[in-house]
Design a protein with these regions (language model features):
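Well-ordered secondary-structure scaffolds
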Residues: 4, 12-24, 28-190
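Divalent-metal coordination cores built from histidine and acidic residues
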Residues: 1-7
């Protein structure tokens, strides 16, 4: 249904309508029965929200409508002018996610954003400090519970129930990776 509504919005020129974006995002969340929600509102060239002002308006709209529906809600704005971690592309990002959950190999930027989002939700639902939330996050990463839950989610969505032990085989052929080495140090910019 959402795909159909989006195509209609595209035809009539209302893709960028904040009220329609808000209703599209929140209707699914509210219908699913969640009681607490932390939203990751993107801003930058990798996002619909090209400016911080647009992202702030969308975040405010989402939070206000959610609260009007008796849903605890917070929206964090994150920069999409670069990739979240070290990878770009669906399969590569899934592999990076699995490495994040199963090893200590964690891109710093991805770790900061993940911790901000997860700790916000934990603070909201458990009424705890950020420090306590971060301890809980590190605990479920260290003891494997986060990876186990991820695998159960993959299985519930129709994936393998042993995805974590077979993901390389399952994702083979779905990704292209090439390392590029430079002769000098520097930064890639727009």
């Amino acid at each position: 249904a959402d795909k159909k509504l989006y195509s209609i919005r595209d035809v009539v020129g209302t893709v960028e309508s904040l009220p329609l974006i808000t209703s599209s995002i929140l209707s699914k969340k509210i219908a699913s029965g969640v009681t607490s929600l932390v939203l990751d509102v993107k801003v930058g060239n990798g996002s619909f929200n090209s400016t911080i002002q647009i992202a702030e308006k969308l975040a405010k709209s989402l939070v206000n409508v959610a609260k009007g529906a008796d849903l605890k809600c917070e929206a964090l704005i994150t920069d999409m002018n670069q990739v979240l971690g070290k990878s770009a592309g669906h399969s590569l990002e899934v592999i990076e996610c699995i490495e994040y959950l199963t090893t200590t190999k964690r891109d710093k930027r991805l770790e900061i954003i993940t911790n901000d989002l997860a700790s916000s939700l934990l603070m909201m639902i458990n009424n705890i400090s950020k420090e306590e939330a971060l301890k809980k996050i590190n605990s479920v990463l260290d003891n494997g519970l986060a990876a186990e839950k991820f695998e159960k989610m993959v299985h519930a969505l129709g994936g393998s129930n042993s995805f974590l032990s077979s993901y390389e085989k399952q994702l083979a052929g779905n990704s292209y990776s090439e390392e590029i080495f430079l002769n000098e140090s520097g930064w890639i910019k727009e």
